[in-house]
Amino acid sequence: AITKSTPVAGLPGRSLVPLFKPGQSNWRTHLYAEYHTHAAAPNFFPQRCVRDGRYKLIESLLPDTLHPDYKNTLTKLHRDYERREARNTLNLMSAIKNAPPKVKQAYALMRKPPRYQLYDLQQDPYEFENLAETPKHTETLNCLRAKLAQWRNDTQDPLLNDEALRQLTQEVQGISKKSSARKHTWRYPTYLSRPSVNK
């Protein structure tokens, strides 16, 4: 409407114009996101996410496997710290080892995420306590899982197909450097274009 352009048929989404007007808008109740990778194998770890006004659910499509970017993330955090605190030193691994239990647990989940992580963003905005296996939150977990599954179906997420996920994982993990990724003839347009099969 603002740009006077014609919407693309079949593309998910809706106008943001109501958000530019004064007052509150009941524009949406849930926000969805997906992640695959930024640079081939070094950080390939596909995840999907949904959140409402209070809770956030993350689904890891390669659950209980080591997150390939865990070590790189710690290295980046260490570098950032050294740039800011040139006079002090930090042994990040030692700091994590000696941290309070909830901090250690958060790093353990980051290193090897389970299938589902559920966080109460009002009570736990930094996402330290995974509530996915807490009986008290079963209803919330199931509701958000259903919303996420519906969104993945509606958007035709190709990684609903187990074979497509397996092929993409194998192809991406076969590339170890960004420079190799640029030269690689990627096959994923072929196998990701097949119809999705729900789990």
Kindly give the residue locations of the regions a language model identified.
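Residues at helix-coil transition
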Residues: 1-4, 21, 123, 153
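C-terminal cap/loop subdomain of S1 sulfatases and analogous C-terminal strand-loop tails that border
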Residues: 3-117, 139
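Long, internal low-complexity/basic segments
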Residues: 95-116, 121-127, 131-199
